[in-house]
């Protein structure tokens, strides 16, 4: 058995909840590590969502999901400023297309009050179109939720991880926890490859695997199954598709919670569907699912140009299935002595993350974890080599970067205007990417109109050089997939 040094707290999972937990724990005088099964952070549900920060009127009134949504939403302006992550408060319109839907709006309005959001304004369809001109003429009424916002989920997770690492947190990627045991007051976390971490306390934030791991230390009372959500993304160079607010419709019989939203990067996104699937690896899109998203998006904005869709994707989230829908909630609990679990965390998990982590740390404190302040803690994203891509820098910053490294003058991604210097800097950050998809999430190479047709081979070559491997060894994503098999000459 290969053993890693004893730590105070081991965080299982490197998604948004796990990385937020790691960063918050680094505020204290603690030895902390993150154990992530994939080869990069944010490889699970955190990478496959809309990036919407919900106001908090959807979840059941008074639930942990509802109250933490309101609390977490309120924490994001400060968090995004600290980390330098793109964030914008857009507001949302919850739209009714039928008389019964107006009754539903008032039900959600009461939930908002119960969750601590306050009383939201209900406006007529005409008033809604005054502030969102492209909204359907068939909309009868809408509830305005001004605190709804948007954030880049990819940049958020990476910035959280970098900041945690800069403050002393160790990241062990490719560490898939297989078994957990308790010995002499210490938790032993065994990986599939034989490695072992010894921790006084454990924060189980493993997303889809959290319930399985929790069942090793607590009676198996939470059953989690996979639920898939499909999305479509529109070209950001299509201003005719621009909208001002996040748009939801009051749910009808078969239309689920599909929304239409702007993104911080300028694209428009629509989705998700909500489908039970057999495996957490089933992140394929389907014709039926994508047609559903297109139909609902067009219902909200009838003149939406669907010819501007540049990609589609799906994510799979953890759905609790052994509790009645009306009683379902997020679960954050002490499952055993010194062992806290976050279970069944799905949408709006990103919004709730700061508040859920706050509760999890309180639980660890109640379990005996000493929370002495770390005077060296730095809240800024000092783990980044530089804060923004070259093309987003001021002329003075650009001159300085070019003098230090001429590769900043070599554009490798035309759609997103990313340079070779940006890619090389990204590869040298704390918690750097190891796959092409990892670079994509950090810099947006491959997220533009051409979807990597121009930049993929160029970025792959730069990665091979930085990693010191043959170009054929660079993988596309966490599940593998080589882009090349060798050189032709």
Which residues does each PLM region occupy?
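Flavin-dependent oxidoreductases
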Residues: 20, 180-185, 189-271, 275-286, ...
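N-terminal Rossmann-like FAD-binding beta1-loop-alpha1 element of flavoenzymes
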Residues: 8-34
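Iron-sulfur (Fe-S) cluster-binding segments and ferredoxin-like electron-carrier domains
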Residues: 419-430, 453-471
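Helical element adjacent to the flavin cofactor pocket in flavoenzyme catalytic cores
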Residues: 144-201
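C-terminal catalytic lobe of FAD-dependent flavoproteins
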Residues: 264-265, 276, 281-411, 418-429, ...
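Short beta-strand to alpha-helix junction loop
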Residues: 67-70, 98-104, 143-162, 283-288, ...
